[in-house]
Amino acid sequence: MAGKRELLMLENFIGGKFLPCNSYIDSYDPSTGEVYCKVPNSGKEEIEAAVEAAREAFPAWSSRSPQERSLVLNRLADVLEQSLEELAQAESKDQGKTLTLARTMDIPRSVLNFRFFASSNLHHVSECTQMSHLGCMHYTVRTPVGIAGLISPWNLPLYLLTWKIAPAIAAGNTVIAKPSEMTSVTAWMFCKLLDKAGVPPGVINIVFGTGPRVGEALVSHPEVPLISFTGSQPTAERITQLSAPHCKKLSLELGGKNPAIIFEDANLEECIPATVRSSFANQGEICLCTSRIFVQRSIYSEFLKRFVEATRKWKVGVPSDPSANMGALISKAHLEKVRSYVLKAQTEGARILCGEGVDQLSLPLRNQAGYFMLPTVITDIKDESRCMTEEIFGPVTCVVPFDSEEEVITRANSVRYGLAATVWSKDVGRIHRVAKKLQSGLVWTNCWLIRELNLPFGGMKSSGIGREGAKDSYDFFTEIKTITIKY
């Protein structure tokens, strides 16, 4: 009889040391449905220890020059890059995404986050003005806020954790980070690299556990004046409630119900593969994924036929399979939630053209209990349907026709979210008109997911509060002060 497999045991990282926890929670391999890891079930006690460590580290770290801090960030990028393959393997196993995606996007982008903020941190300028008639000069300075509370999601675990840590410590803050309890492994591995990169103890503290226990303890702590959160709207509402008594600075990057608008002059050779990717990349578990596709009626039938054909070629497979385009969803509960949207659409009279309930999914025996789902295309669905108004966060997209430019803008803007949109057309004038009228924080035209990290990232309406990016992140992680000199 084969021996029982040993589970990976994670520990909190506080004050430069790994510390065990009194209790642990199970973490699952999404591709098999098996428990493979134990994550600390931290709470108030661990947050108190992390706050003490971050408080002690803050004076020395914040006193370092931007140049000195940037050297540390670049060393962090170096050690991450040296561990790229190991981190990619772990990210794929922990999250369910394909190993190819982890290798080519998640870990390289984590490296870039530190390199980018190491550079941008050196190029901020202050404002200065004179009032000669009063003999006064005014100028501004920015100072770090203090201890930054960072809460990152499960869909892009290390990618979004480092997107928060890098600008926070570059600006001179110390941090307490809480990754998702479902995808904590690469954050734990990251902690092992900090000493090698020369990060002083207490500058980066990572505490693992659930939102209701450790997340609430972090958000409500009076010595944590700033919270950066990426995740769901209900959790953001709770964070806002807990933060209000302390008047904390908040950055909330939430969900989306992102439209793609495809006009009759679109280049379908480019549009269709790009829209398949924007709909189903990372199992549709990216806040920027397309979940509503509006196609001008004159090309609707052709687009739909070709889009479904291309979707059926989008291979679902074991994450380690180099030919797989899609891996497993994050959890059994999430898989059931995504499937429930498809069932609801069917009861409303919508047609499922491919995917869930239509096509057969073939997997190796070991992976048949994993959380896999075929990419699913829905049509003949009303704009008021839950599938057209609520964030599904899975491999499900709806395709509907439209007639006029004005009509499609109104329909695209009809949901409570406003994170991202894509527009496909050869008419430059139309692109500018439509992009300006869309209620989205990001609009891609004739492309998707091309990011310039110097520019703002974030959404409108219920998609969040604030922006992230070079200057926006620097402004968020610092306090501005106006100084007046009488001469």
From Swiss-Prot:
Its EC number is 1.2.1.32. One of its GO terms (biological process) is retinal metabolic process. Disulfide bonds: none annotated. The modification Phosphoserine is found at residue 362. Pathway: Amino-acid degradation; L-kynurenine degradation. NAD(+) binds at residues 231-236. Keywords: Cytoplasm, NAD, Oxidoreductase, Phosphoprotein. It is an enzyme of class 1 (oxidoreductase). The record marks 155 as: Transition state stabilizer. It catalyses: 2-aminomuconate 6-semialdehyde + NAD(+) + H2O = (2Z,4E)-2-aminomuconate + NADH + 2 H(+). The active site is at 253 (proton acceptor), 287 (nucleophile). It is found in: Cytoplasm. PROSITE patterns: ALDEHYDE_DEHYDR_CYS, ALDEHYDE_DEHYDR_GLU. It comes from the Eukaryota. GO terms for molecular function: aminomuconate-semialdehyde dehydrogenase activity; retinal dehydrogenase activity. Pfam families: Aldedh. This is 2-aminomuconic semialdehyde dehydrogenase. It comes from Mus musculus. The gene is Aldh8a1.
